[in-house]
Amino acid sequence: MSSALRGKRVVNTRALHQACQLDLLLERRGAVPLSYPCIAIEPPEDFGPLDQALRNLVRGSFTWVAFSSANAAHAIATRLETLGMKRTLPAGVLIAAVGPATARAVLDSFGRSPRIIPGRHDGTALAFAMPIKPGETVLAPGSDIARSELTEILGEKGARVTSIVAFRTAAGSGGVDMPLKLRERGVDAITFSSPSAVEGFFERLSRSGLDVASLVRIPVACIGDTTRETAERFGLAAHSASSQSLDGMLDLLEWLFVPVGSGGTAWS
C-alpha cells in the first residue's frame, strides 16, 4: 500500500549518531529524509563525579537507577567499560526508564529490562511511577541540561537522589542547508524527538536571519508531549504521537498527509 509520506521531504533533527535509524524508517515509507542535526551528544567535561557514582553503584550503594533517556543508558554502559568494570548493573538494583526507547537502550546496554516504565514518557511521570520508600537511594544519570522534575519529585517522596551528568547536550552541526530549503519551500515536514532538538533547531536558524514565521505552514511531528509543548512555545504547529516512538511519530506524520475532502489533508 502506498504511503502518504511518499515523496515528502522530512527534516530529521536527531543527533548525527542517531539519525540513521529515523532516516531508514522514513525511506521505507517513501519519504525523503533531510538530515539537519540539531543536537550533539558529548562526554562530560569532568568525569570525576560520574566515575565516583559508578563505583558506588557497583558496590551496591543505590536502590534504584532511573534512566531519563537512551543516551543516559548508553553513556553509563560505555563509561563502565572504560573504567574496566563489567557492563552490567548490580543484580539487586531496581531500574526505571522514562519510555520504551529508553527501556530498549537499557536492555541492549545491560541485558535487563526496567521494572518501571510510566504511561506518559517524561521525568515527572517517571518519578511518580516509581514506588519509592523513604530513605531509598536513586542514581539519576542524565544530560547537563536535564530538567529537574525527576530529582525534585523523588526527593519529595523521601528518596536520596544522586543526580549525575552522564553526557552533555551540545549544539548540532552539518546536514542540509536548512535556511535555503525553507526559502525554496523544499521542506514538507519536520520531526523532533526531544525538547533540546527543538531548541537546537531554532538556535541554528537564528544565525541565518531567516524569518521563522514561515515555519507555521509546515506540519511538525514530535515524540512526547514535552517536546510538542516546547515546539509550540516557538510558534510551531506541532503534534505529538500517541505512541511515543519513532514509528509512532511517523504514523502521526503519515496521518497528517492522508488525503481528505476535495484535495486537502488532515494537516491542511
Model-derived features: positions:
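Conserved beta-alpha
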Residues: 1-268
